[in-house]
């Protein structure tokens, strides 16, 4: 049975999500920060975590963004195969939602229309949109405003199959060590393993939208997430890059089949707020 969705609903929801994600920390990230504050051994690290929480409190009370970099809007649309869109084109609707959200929410406009000419578009469009067709008649929207302090620290490694799991571990640690304080730690580390050059990067990005409380259903991946979180926190980078045990809140790993000749690994790093929002229409 075909279900009709008016794209005005897409506009409305994305507008609201842009504002909410930039003003309020998601429940999983709020809990992660509070847990880290309670367990952090470094006095300076604990002080920084308390300051980050005070910043969140002020943002909530005064309805201002939790960070001055309100990011480039990255949107995942999971569209049920039984959905028919009515109204403006879906891409146009997504960008209109971003436009309204960033304008009405007084969020910083951070997008330039050309990577070389670099003239600001003045409304934070276009968004980066990823589509997938899934069973059903619903539309799931996942929005992640991605700041570029952490985005610039992300890496892709085209490993050889012989590098194996140890090569993957080394790649993840290398990316985090190179990022250091520049990714505004404590960070969330999204990792994509497998696929192709572009697929592993997309996996790593999608991994960042997963709750930090949700672990991989695959046993070896779940064990790898745990091991890498321990190794990353042993680096001592700490909150704000000034030392401590809390360098990362979580390591989220996604995998995909790959070619016999390759082992692509992408590491997409996000800062201590790791903004993301989810809605289903």
Task: Identify the function of each model-found stretch.
Residues 1-281:
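Non-transmembrane, aqueous-exposed alpha-helical and coiled segments at domain scale
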């Amino acid at each position: 049975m075909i279900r009709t969705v008016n794209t005005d609903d897409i506009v409305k929801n994305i507008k609201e999500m842009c504002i909410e994600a930039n003003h309020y920390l998601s429940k999983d990230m709020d809990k992660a920060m509070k847990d880290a504050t309670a367990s952090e051994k470094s006095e300076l690290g604990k002080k920084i975590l308390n300051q980050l929480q005070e910043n969140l409190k002020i943002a909530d009370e005064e309805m201002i963004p939790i960070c001055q970099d309100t990011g480039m809007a990255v949107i995942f649309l999971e569209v049920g195969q039984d959905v028919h869109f009515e109204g403006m084109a879906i891409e146009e609707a997504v960008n209109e939602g971003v436009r309204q959200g960033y304008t009405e929410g007084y969020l910083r406009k951070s997008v330039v229309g050309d990577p070389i000419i670099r003239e600001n578009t003045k409304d934070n469009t276009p968004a980066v949109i990823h589509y997938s067709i899934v069973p059903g008649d619903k539309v799931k929207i996942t929005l992640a405003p991605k700041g570029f302090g952490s985005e610039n620290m992300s890496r892709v490694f085209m490993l050889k199959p012989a590098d194996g799991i140890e090569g993957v571990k080394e790649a993840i640690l290398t990316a985090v060590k190179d990022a250091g304080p520049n990714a505004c730690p404590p960070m969330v580390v999204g990792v994509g393993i497998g696929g192709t050059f572009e697929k592993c990067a997309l996996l790593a990005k999608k991994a960042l939208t997963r709750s930090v409380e949700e672990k991989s259903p695959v046993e070896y991946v779940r064990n790898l997430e745990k091991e890498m979180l321990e190794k990353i926190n042993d680096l001592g980078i700490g909150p704000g890059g000034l030392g401590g045990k809390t360098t990362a809140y979580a390591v989220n790993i996604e995998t995909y089949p790959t070619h016999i000749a390759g082992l692509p690994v992408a590491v997409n790093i996000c800062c201590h707020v790791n903004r993301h929002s989810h809605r289903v229409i």
